[in-house]
Amino acid sequence: MKVPFVNFMISSFPAAVLVGAVVGFMIGRKYSVADASRGYSSKNANKASNPEKESPVSVSNDEDSESETELLDMLKGNSSLAALALAEGQTKMVLVVRTDLGMTKGKIAAQCAHAALACYKIASAVDPDLVRIWENAGQAKITLQAQTEETLELLQAQAMSLGLCARVIHDAGRTQIASGSATVLGIGPGPVSVINEVTGSLKLF
């Protein structure tokens, strides 16, 4: 009885080896495919979370080669006062005080406040971008002096010809001076270079 059993085992051994090999191959292939799938998904997830790592881009600095002088010349010829002020980075408002009236310091302060407010309201309506640039730059205000009413009127006309806001304040005449007297000229806000074309020769007050 033992001999047939031995013969059976011997004859069945090659088949068992073959079956084991096939099963092992299929199991190994299954885990290989699963690992590959997980690796591919992880790679895609990394690409999605870090898109900049996939294709780095180099930026050229050739566009920065244009000189500031050329830019300013272009703006002066073709652009608004706001664009010029933004390019220069300097803006101001000037208050030209008439000195021949003998106004007190308090009176002068009040008249300068009237001029500054008047210019601010007009400029805000006409060129709000320019006003915002001036505000963001610190709202510079400079007080200058002139001797006569005629000088104030001349400066006003010159400023307006350059596109600047210019307003002469006339006093109501309730306190120190005659009614209707021109007291202060406000100019701006505007680019420093443009305002200096009008008031560059005046002395500080």
From Swiss-Prot:
PTM annotation (Phosphoserine): residues: S65, S79
GO-annotated cellular components: cytosol; mitochondrial matrix; mitochondrion
Task: Give the Polar residues compositional bias ranges.
Answer: 40-49
Swiss-Prot/TrEMBL GO biological process terms:
mitochondrial translation
Swiss-Prot/TrEMBL catalytic activity: an N-acyl-L-alpha-aminoacyl-tRNA + H2O = an N-acyl-L-amino acid + a tRNA + H(+)
- Cited function: The natural substrate for this enzyme may be peptidyl-tRNAs which drop off the ribosome during protein synthesis.
What's the protein name? Probable peptidyl-tRNA hydrolase 2
Which organism's genome codes for this protein?
A: Schizosaccharomyces pombe (strain 972 / ATCC 24843)
Which taxonomic lineage is given here? Eukaryota, Fungi, Dikarya, Ascomycota, Taphrinomycotina
